[in-house]
């Protein structure tokens, strides 16, 4: 045997393999990557100066320093630019859709066209506006056709008559100032009012009118079916804005949290949230008329519904459709038409666990797919249900801040950070497995419920990076701040170990999607806290939310 020949052959094969690997990693993979490493390492715009005891200001690279944050829809009115309001949004939705696209609600087999829903809302509108009611309390899920149409009609009154929808976590146990109308789900809930029905000028019950015969009501009570009786399909919603832009400055909604703190949100919060969601889609993957948004009903429960309107209206504005689904019943078959899914992480994990395949070939596909994703290359080769999930292109995972109640109370004393390695949110490696098995992009979003409309921050559509275990055990990457917000880290006396020089601290934000405390004592505390940590200037400290801004400009929150 010629050993010299064998040695040459081995060396030649080794050189070919190394050369092919170099060529693949240096050139071919770069052409296939959705986003370059340079782009992923520079995701935020950072102000050039900072004050003592705080970091520079961070904002998404989509809204560079010196340019305005996302503040609305940028509509024209003569020589002016308007932010817009609900009236503009619904008018445009009806013009784009011609009433044909649909929404499917829970508890109903049929889907409702927008012309039906618009006709119902316009039929309800006179009843909610003819007595000059102040606020309209809504304690019914938006995932039902009754709750949705009543909310829609209430939003119409916010522009036309000034009556404001007030989203409630439950039927109030105490009298709420200025709430003249109460919307509840059933006669059972009506029975539990136990005398408090006298607080309201009108009560709307979303239940069968026949059952009303069992109750001897001394107040003005009407059912949803009676309200919409005689409605007709309507493909138009006429709205002409006033010349002084006054409608853009009106209130959009009040939202009360489960711990009884109420915040008000202006029309600019709504339109900015819509624009922010639209802006989050990269070139080539924009929203289109084929979109079908599926929303978990848990995210649509009355006061929690604050987070769904931006996504829902954005999809409808592009001629898409939507549905609400009970998270306990999510399966691959129920997602056949879905292009965008908005739910919580545990629901997606459960879906994958119930459909994952354990064969050797499937494991090879999954390993291959996750490796490609870690290189920045998207693939659908490991999708668990190729037929059912064919249309699914992006999943939005809602993650809430650790203690929204503490943030809502604006406490004087700042809590201590207590780090833990116990991570509830999926690691970056697990997120890539979810992407691989669903065959879709996954965007992780951070919410501060009841206080901020839309996400505080979210990961990039194309960000598939995998961090080391030590990083994942310590922090969660939530990407950049929403384009409606800018933020900074501030130093706190109770956490001296967080080094502001290393961009560590407590998160403060300001922008156009933040609610304003309604109660005078909460408002006073909020102003005092803003002055203490931000020098006023509109900053809102998210008390107890500790993290850092990375070299890539992304927001990293410590595991607590």
From Swiss-Prot:
The keyword Amino-acid biosynthesis does not apply. GO terms for cellular component: endoplasmic reticulum; membrane. It is found in: Membrane. Keywords: Membrane, Transmembrane, Transmembrane helix. The chain crosses the membrane at residues 9-29, 61-81, 136-156, 305-325, 442-462. Disulfide bonds: none annotated. This is Putative uncharacterized protein YHR045W.
